[in-house]
């Protein structure tokens, strides 16, 4: 019995060591990953005008975990966290609003996390070169990037696995998936270029130079990517297969 217990403890210890190494690896990656890869894109959150009451919250805002306090739409100045909904008042939720810090889309996660800690901010507004809000990054988003064995923004937003193998060597992929995560799933030796697109959708748009529609294709890292589902804004889902 003692020997079996020792073996079990050894296996458990090895698993813990593996997890710790992965966390350390993820922490080191914070210096390389841009906020654009982790942020929640503009179309994924809800903005509500003042005043904001509990009855105004819809399922999307609850799933997102926060609601943006209404403004001019070009910049996000504050959000209302919804992590503890049971303790929220019925009226005037805007009184609980927290200011967000602005950060450029090209910033790396490590300095942004440090700035959030220094300013006691729970979220950052990601802005493009014109000062327009293109995304929101929360403290929880960064924690997920650190603690998850395979960090994925698409999985976090969609609440399902964004890359599914439908047949051997053929994958259905959500277009929101980052190329960094996709390369890990496909076991590719790929390091994202800070100057290039970060998602499957962005890759398609860059290569085609237009909004992709169903049937459009492009090539990437020895694979062919074909759009199998799209909306008016662009691709939603693609099929990826290795080129023979």
Model-derived regions: residue spans:
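Soluble cytosolic regulatory domains appended to membrane proteins
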Residues: 1-244
